[in-house]
């Protein structure tokens, strides 16, 4: 989205299975970490404890993680998995969107949050002046007969953290005509193709994006 109607960004995304963040948590006297990527888990768990003003600690075991910085939204999935497991262990009732706001996720795309809530092919509405987390505009079941091939370049990783924010901040404003064309392609191209299981049309419209 180009911002002319008061909203920026806007995303499309598809959830995938078998590349999960699997986390276990229980109350503890202090923060205890086991398993994978403790250097990534620690600040997330500390942020949860600080945000909820809970004086207890957490025992967190990270069993599995999706690949990082390759476009799978692993940072959001890890943050929400730890936050959900930790909040549940501490008896704190928080929705995924409340946890996302506490964890500072969804600054641009809402796909990772929506994917944590449920599966499917997802379109979010970007950010407006008062947006906390981008709203889901559409969620469709992806045709089960369709297959997706994921290719990872192990020679390099994408940006994250401050470099990623700087890269987004440096992007020029998208021309209104291009933003309109992309929105139209999603609304009357991609979404109907998914709804009608029209793989040829879906592929053609996706190639336009």
Regions found by a protein language model. Name each.
Residues 29, 82, 205-209:
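Short, basic/glycine-rich phosphate-binding loops at helix/coil junctions
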Residues 4-11, 95-209:
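ATP-dependent small-molecule kinase catalytic core of the GHMP/sugar-kinase superfamily
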Residues 82-86, 90, 123, 130-131:
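Amphipathic, positively biased hydrophobic alpha-helical segments used for protein targeting
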Residues 1-74, 84-96, 107:
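ATP-binding N-lobe of GHMP and related small-molecule kinases
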């Amino acid at each position: 989205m180009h911002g002319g109607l008061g909203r920026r960004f806007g995303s499309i995304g598809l959830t995938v299975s078998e590349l999960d963040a699997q986390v276990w948590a229980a109350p503890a006297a202090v923060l205890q970490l086991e398993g994978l990527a403790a250097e990534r888990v620690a600040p997330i768990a500390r942020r949860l404890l600080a945000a909820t003003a809970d004086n207890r600690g957490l025992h967190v075991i990270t069993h599995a993680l999706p690949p990082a910085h390759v476009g799978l939204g692993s940072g959001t999935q890890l943050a929400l998995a730890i936050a959900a497991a930790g909040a549940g262990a501490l008896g704190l009732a928080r929705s995924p969107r409340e946890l996302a706001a506490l964890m500072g996720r969804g600054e641009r795309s809402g796909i990772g949050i929506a994917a944590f809530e449920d599966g499917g092919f997802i379109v979010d509405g970007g950010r407006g002046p008062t947006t906390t987390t981008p709203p889901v505009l559409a969620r469709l079941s992806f045709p089960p007969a369709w297959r997706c091939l994921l290719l990872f370049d192990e020679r390099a990783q994408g940006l994250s953290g401050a470099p990623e924010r700087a890269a987004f901040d440096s992007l020029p404003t998208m021309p209104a005509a291009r933003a309109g064309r992309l929105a139209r392609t999603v609304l009357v191209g991609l979404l109907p193709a998914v709804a009608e299981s029209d793989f040829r049309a879906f592929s053609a419209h996706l190639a336009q994006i």
